[in-house]
Structure formats: C-alpha cells, structure tokens
Amino acid sequence: MSTHIIVQARMNSSRLPGKVLKEVLGKTLLEYQLERLKRVINTGKIIVATTIYPIDDPIVALCNRLSVSTYRGSESDVLSRYAEASILFLSQTVVRITADCPLIDPMLIDRTIDFYRRCSFDYVSTDHATYPRGMDVEVFSTDMLQMANSNTMQPTDREHVTPYFYQNPDRFSIGTYSEDLQASHYRLTVDTPEDFQLIQILLENLYPKNHKFNLEDILKCLQKNPQWSYVNQHIVQKII
C-alpha cells in the first residue's frame, strides 16, 4: 500500500510571512520538519505541496537540495493541490501534515497510521483535546480525497482540505486517535512571532543534545520550564 506524506507549505502566510524558512541554529523550520518526517516508518514518499507562485521558489529549492519531492498547485484551493499531488505520486493513502508543525513527532504519525489501518476508518485525525496544536496528523484515502475534490465547492472545504470528511459523518466513518495524555493547552504550531519564539527556545534546548527528540521530551522540557509556554499562551487558534 502506497502511503505518502503530503505537506502543505507556502511563504505567503498572513500572520507570519516566510515562517517555514525562518531559521533556528542555522536550519529552517521546514528542514527540521522534513528531518523528522523522514523517520516515519509506515510511509513511502514525502511530498511538499506548495504553490505555483515565484514567492515559493525557495521552498522548492530547499526540497530539491534535501531530495524531497514537490508539487506545485493552486494557492487558495489547497484541496485541489492535495488531490492533484496524490494522483501524480500514485498515493493510495495520504497523511496530511502542515508545514506550521515543525516539531511533529514521527512516532505519533506512525501510531496514527497504524490506528487508521487497524480500525478501517475512512478518516482519522489526532485528538485536539489530547495533543498540543502542532501535533496534528490526518490520514485518509486518495479515493476520499478525489471524492471531496469532485463534490464540494465550499470555500472552507477547498482551503482547509478535510472539513468535507468530518462534516459528513453520515457518509464517512470518522476516527480520532488519542492517548492517555493531557497536553492540549500547549501550542507547538507556528502561526505568529510568539509561536516561533517558543519553537526557537525548544529547538535551542533540545536539538543539540538529541536530534531525535520526541513529544515526550518536549513535554518534559515544558513541565520543567513552565515559563516558556507563557510566550504564546494567549494566541487563539483560528476557527475553521
């Protein structure tokens, strides 16, 4: 079964432009994320899906240097970008990751894929009530992706890719992967300068000691240094 990770990435972010190529310790956030994604066991290719615009040429150049596949499509119609990329790379199952999650845990991705395969759901996502923002994983079939691409023209569905799935539970079986963890109050995503500040602190403290640090290591670090999480505690997650 060809299970591919597709990462959506672009430079033209409204709240923090160029965030995916912001650097910590001489490496971009996208490099850190791709390094982590390469440790996922249950997948084949990693594909970075960006836009057709020249502003995103540096993303493609970075991926070329790192030998990571890319696809270029619509900026606003992200659903079509995913659908086209999945067909081009012959994916049967898609793992959706966004580039604003640079510290995504590869072991969490593997466990989510295992859960999806074992339980035969149409769509699986990590539980937002369990994990920090920034540990967001979605798994679904390319067939479902093509169905959504053909059947919905709602702007929210086109921009955010997967609302069509979880807003139609009568048509699709929806699964949520969770563990015995209460960490949803932390923000490990990068939407704002404050978010970047926290990620910078974590990378500077964790990466030099252990390039393969995981979510457990991050949480231990935040529990030991609770003041760090105050940096972006006030940031409100955008509602879809």
Predicted feature residues:
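Short beta-strand-to-loop acidic/aromatic patch adjacent to the donor-nucleotide binding site
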Residues: 86, 90-101
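Acidic donor-binding segment of Leloir-type glycosyltransferases
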Residues: 38-70
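Conserved donor nucleotide-binding strand/loop of the catalytic core
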Residues: 64-77, 87
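Basic phosphate/pyrophosphate-binding loop/patch that engages nucleotide-derived ligands
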Residues: 88, 111-122, 141-157, 167
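Conserved donor-nucleotide/metal-binding helix-loop-beta segment in metal-dependent transferases, i.e.
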Residues: 84, 105-130
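N-terminal glycine-rich phosphate-binding loop and ensuing alpha1 helix
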Residues: 2-49
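Conserved nucleotide-sugar donor-binding
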Residues: 91-92, 136-149, 193-197
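Conserved alpha/beta core of the MobA/IspD/sugar-nucleotide pyrophosphorylase nucleotidyltransferase superfamily
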Residues: 140, 159-240
